[in-house]
Amino acid sequence: FSQSAFPNSHHTSSSFSSFLEKFSEPSYSDILKMICPITLYYNYHKKYNFGNLHLNTRYYGKTYSATDSDLSEEAQRLLKLIPNEKDQRNAAQKHTYSRLIYQRRNKIAHEFYAVGLSLNFQEDRENQLPHIVLSHEFIGEDLIPGHWELNIPEQFTTSVFLSAIKGYLSYCEQNQILPFKPESERAYRFSWYDK
């Protein structure tokens, strides 16, 4: 569906994330457009000398939901430390939750990545949202903060996909367009040839 909805996109990742952001329910779409400061930090901290994250590390099991304002503020602070405006835009785009879901999809589909992560849900929450957790480890008898981990619960991903598909099909019905490209234009038919 994403390639049919965004046929002029030169990158599958762009059409995938644009599809999710445009056609899923607004409550999901808003989250998908947010930038994850954790993946941004770990990807660029050495290159741009970010220093430390400005998140609370005092509490064992500290969890931040994707909608937490502290995460948005930290993402914006980190982006401002990237000197080039074009690099800022590229970094921001690569670390939206929609793009991170695409990256996870690729790891599973193309690299046969096992999703055997630690528990990736938040207790006592009906709606599971992406969140980050500070891991800890014991050194002797001391509990030492480790690194931050991003968790995108399966329930969230499934809900986003179903919402986007439903939104896209509704859009196609309202605008009287076929949801798929004509078979003769599908990219897989030309995969044997150079363009």
Which residues make up each language-model segment?
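Short, hydrophobic, well-ordered secondary-structure elements
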Residues: F1-N8, Y102
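Short, charged low-complexity intrinsically disordered segments located at boundaries
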Residues: A5-N8, Y28-D30, Y48-L53, H131-I139, ...
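Short acidic alpha-helical/loop segments enriched in Asp/Glu that coordinate divalent cations
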Residues: A5-S18, S118-F121
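Alpha-helical structural elements
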Residues: H11-S14, C36, H54-L55, Y59, ...
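Hydrophobic, well-ordered secondary-structure segments
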Residues: H11-S18, K22-D30, K62, Y168, ...
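Short, surface-exposed, charge-dense and proline/glycine-enriched linear segments
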Residues: S17-E21, T39-K46, P145-V160
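Short, mixed-charge amphipathic alpha-helical segments
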Residues: L20-K107, E111-S118
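Polyanionic, low-complexity intrinsically disordered segments
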Residues: E73, R77-K195
